[in-house]
């Protein structure tokens, strides 16, 4: 399937095997299966290649100048490169439990220089988030163990910890698979913790959904205002925000003029 593929043995026996593939100018990271977890365009590393990663950045409609972003799940560093390029003033922390993923990302996926604005932490993200109290503007969760979404990242306790970690206008964003038989139960837990302030933004392909939960109700909910914001952001970030708004309207509860959050 892939003209180039290399296998990297896991540093921890219980963790999935890390593999790298290349097809044309696209380098991808896999965890124990053919499923692509992260991809990088070798000609344009900051570009978000996978549609689910693009959808997850839809939170920028409500906060286009986050000061602090917590990533749970480093993968191939797609968000880290994007943030470094388009949000250079944001402090970004990427947490991953798998040391081999971190090593491979550093070696093969052109991560930003680690320093004041970017840090990688080897830790369990479900534990690490507990150190934050109202201080992070966005939490991006993309946790996959090679077979399914990591259970520890779908519990009400985890969602409560994330809610406490968020700043007043903070947004929790997670990547889930709509075909997972547990999907609706995940949504119900999130709705319960965030008191209904949850929306779904389907990715363009493959059944992934960027699910967003808000610490407090955002002021920007009018469709007309959202479309205006989308037009402003498309040129700045190179993402299809207008299409995001269309998909939000197709998927979520609404009135004639407003998205209900």
From Swiss-Prot:
It comes from Chromobacterium violaceum (strain ATCC 12472 / DSM 30191 / JCM 1249 / CCUG 213 / NBRC 12614 / NCIMB 9131 / NCTC 9757 / MK). It catalyses: S-adenosyl 3-(methylsulfanyl)propylamine + putrescine = S-methyl-5'-thioadenosine + spermidine + H(+). PROSITE patterns: PABS_2. InterPro entries: PABS, SAM-dependent_MTases_sf, Spermi_synthase. Pathway: Amine and polyamine biosynthesis; spermidine biosynthesis; spermidine from putrescine: step 1/1. The active site is at 142 (proton acceptor). The gene is speE. This is Polyamine aminopropyltransferase. Catalyzes the irreversible transfer of a propylamine group from the amino donor S-adenosylmethioninamine (decarboxy-AdoMet) to putrescine (1,4-diaminobutane) to yield spermidine. One of its GO terms (cellular component) is cytoplasm. PANTHER family: THERMOSPERMINE SYNTHASE ACAULIS5. One of its GO terms (molecular function) is thermospermine synthase activity.
